[in-house]
C-alpha cells in the first residue's frame, strides 16, 4: 500500500515502474509463448502429448534466433514445449524458472517426435500475439496472449471458454499508469525523482542486484558472443583503456551476453524486455559506483533511468523495427547525467544527442548480437552525457532532433510507429527466407 500522503501522480509513476520493471528469465518473446503453453497445460486434463502454437510476425522475429535458458537450443518450438512440460503457470515472465532437467529432456523428446509446431498467425493485426494449444488425445486447452508479454486475454478448453478478458474499463476503475505516463513530461519525472521519499522507491535497487549478477555471469566468457569478457581481456592486453567508459560498456554488454546466451539467471526487465532492463540499469550502476553513491542516490538515478525509458517506450509499439536498447539507453543517459550534476538541461541535452546518434538502429530479432547493440547504446549514452556536461548536444537544427527534447522524443517515436513499419516487414521477410 502507498503512503496516503504521497502525491497521487507519483503513485501512478511508481505503479508504472512496478508494472514494467519485473524479473524475467529468458528472452521475453519466447517466454511469452512458453507462458501461454504453461497456462494451457495447467488447464489440460492429463499430460501434454502435442503442442500447436501461433504467433505474430514480430514475435516470430524475436524468437527465431534466441537461446531458451537451460536448453542450449534456440527458437520458439523449444520454448513452447518446455513451457507446456515444465513451466510454472503462475510465474509470469519467470515461467521457466522451475524447469527440471527431466522436463527439458521431455521437451526435447517431444520436439524430436515432431509433436510441436509454431506458425505465424494469419491474419494478425496484433504486434504481440502468442497462442498455445496443448493436446492430450482428443482433449485440449488453448491460451491466447495479446498486447503484453503476460497479458492473457482468452483461455478455452474442449469443454468451453474458461476466461475472456473484458475489453472495457469498469466504471470507477482507475486508468492504467501507462496512460497517466503518456500525459507527463521529463521535467515532471525529474521532480518526482528528486522529491519522492526514498522508502517509496527503494524497491528499484533490486534491478541493480539482478542485473549485476547477470553481468558477473556474462564476464565468465561462456555466454553468447562474450562481448563483455572479450573487451575486458583487451583492457588487460592494453588495447582498451581501463576507464569508466570501458567499464560501462563491458559490464552492460556482459549482462546481455549472459541473457541472450541462455544463462539461467533472471534479468530485471523494462517494458517487457530484459535487454532494455539491463541497458537502463548497468550504466547507471557503474557510474554510481565510480562516484561512491549511496543506496538512496543509486535508487533515485535508477528510478529516473527506468521511468524515463518507460516514458519513451510508451510512445512506441510494444515491438517494432527500432532497437529499443536505444530508448532504454536514453533512460540510462538521464540517470547517469543526474548522478553527475542533476540538472534538467544536462539530462535533456544528453537524450537529444542520443536521438541524433543511434535512432536508426534496427531490431532484426532477438539473438546473441543484441549484446552488440546494447554495448553500442550504452557507449552512446555515456558519450552523450559527456557532451552535455560540456554544454554541447545535437541541436534542433539537425535531422529529426527538435529544439525541445519532448518533441525530439515524439519525432523518434513517430518514425518508429509509422514509416519504420515497412522496414519491419522487410526485416521479417529476410529472416523468414533464411529460415526456410
Curated annotation (Swiss-Prot):
InterPro entries given for it? Ser_deHydtase-like_asu, UPF0597
Q: Name one GO molecular function term.
A: L-cysteine desulfhydrase activity
A biological process term (GO) from this entry: L-cysteine catabolic process to pyruvate
Pfam families associated with the record: SDH_alpha (PF03313)
Family from the record? Belongs to the UPF0597 family.
What is this protein's record name? UPF0597 protein YhaM
Species this chain originates from: Escherichia coli (strain SE11)
Q: What is the lineage of its organism?
A: Bacteria, Pseudomonadati, Pseudomonadota, Gammaproteobacteria, Enterobacterales
| Gene expressing this chain | yhaM
Amino acid at each position: 500500500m502507498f503512503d496516503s500522503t504521497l502525491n497521487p501522480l507519483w503513485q501512478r509513476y511508481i505503479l508504472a515502474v512496478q508494472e514494467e520493471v519485473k524479473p524475467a528469465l529468458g528472452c521475453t518473446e519466447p517466454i511469452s509463448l512458453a507462458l501461454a503453453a504453461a497456462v494451457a497445460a495447467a488447464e489440460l486434463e492429463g499430460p501434454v502429448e502435442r503442442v500447436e502454437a501461433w504467433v505474430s510476425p514480430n514475435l516470430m522475429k524475436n524468437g527465431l534466433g534466441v537461446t531458451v535458458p537451460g536448453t542450449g537450443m534456440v527458437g520458439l518450438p523449444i520454448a513452447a514445449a518446455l513451457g507446456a512440460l515444465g513451466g510454472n503457470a503462475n510465474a509470469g515472465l519467470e515461467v521457466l524458472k522451475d524447469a527440471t532437467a527431466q522436463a527439458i529432456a521431455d521437451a526435447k523428446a517431444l520436439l524430436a517426435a515432431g509433436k510441436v509446431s509454431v506458425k505465424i498467425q494469419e491474419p494478425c493485426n496484433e504486434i504481440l500475439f502468442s497462442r498455445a494449444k496443448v493436446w492430450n488425445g482428443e482433449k485440449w486447452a488453448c491460451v491466447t496472449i495479446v498486447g503484453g508479454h503476460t497479458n492473457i486475454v482468452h483461455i478455452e478448453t474442449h469443454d468451453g471458454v474458461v476466461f475472456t478478458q473484458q475489453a472495457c474499463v469498469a466504471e470507477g476503475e482507475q486508468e492504467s499508469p501507462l496512460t497517466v505516463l503518456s500525459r507527463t513530461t521529463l521535467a515532471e519525472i525529474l521532480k518526482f525523482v528528486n522529491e519522492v521519499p526514498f522508502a517509496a522507491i527503494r524497491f528499484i535497487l533490486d534491478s541493480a542486484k539482478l542485473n549485476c549478477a547477470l553481468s558477473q555471469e556474462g564476464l565468465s566468457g561462456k555466454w553468447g558472443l562474450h562481448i563483455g569478457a572479450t573487451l575486458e581481456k583487451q583492457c588487460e592486453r592494453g588495447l582498451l583503456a581501463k576507464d569508466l567508459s570501458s567499464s560501462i560498456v563491458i559490464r552492460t554488454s556482459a549482462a546481455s551476453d549472459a541473457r541472450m546466451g541462455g544463462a539461467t539467471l533472471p534479468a530485471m526487465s523494462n517494458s517487457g524486455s530484459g535487454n532494455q532492463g539491463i541497458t537502463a540499469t548497468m550504466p547507471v550502476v557503474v557510474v554510481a559506483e565510480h562516484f561512491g553513491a549511496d543506496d538512496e542516490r543509486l535508487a533515485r538515478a535508477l528510478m529516473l533511468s527506468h521511468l524515463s525509458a518507460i516514458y519513451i517506450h510508451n510512445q512506441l509499439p510494444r515491438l517494432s523495427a527500432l532497437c529499443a536498447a536505444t530508448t532504454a539507453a536514453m533512460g540510462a543517459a538521464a540517470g547517469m547525467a543526474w548522478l553527475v550534476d542533476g540538472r534538467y538541461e544536462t539530462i535533456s541535452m544528453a537524450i537529444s544527442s542520443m536521438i541524433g546518434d543511434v535512432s536508426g538502429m534496427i531490431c532484426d530479432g532477438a539473438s546473441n548480437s543484441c549484446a552488440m547493440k546494447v554495448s553500442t547504446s550504452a557507449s552512446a549514452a555515456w558519450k552523450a552525457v559527456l557532451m552535455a556536461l560540456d554544454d554541447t548536444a545535437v541541436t534542433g537544427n539537425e535531422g529529426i532532433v527538435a529544439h525541445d527534447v519532448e518533441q525530439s522524443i515524439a519525432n523518434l517515436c513517430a518514425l518508429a510507429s509509422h514509416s519504420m513499419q515497412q522496414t519491419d516487414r522487410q526485416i521479417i521477410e529476410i529472416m523468414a527466407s533464411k529460415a526456410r
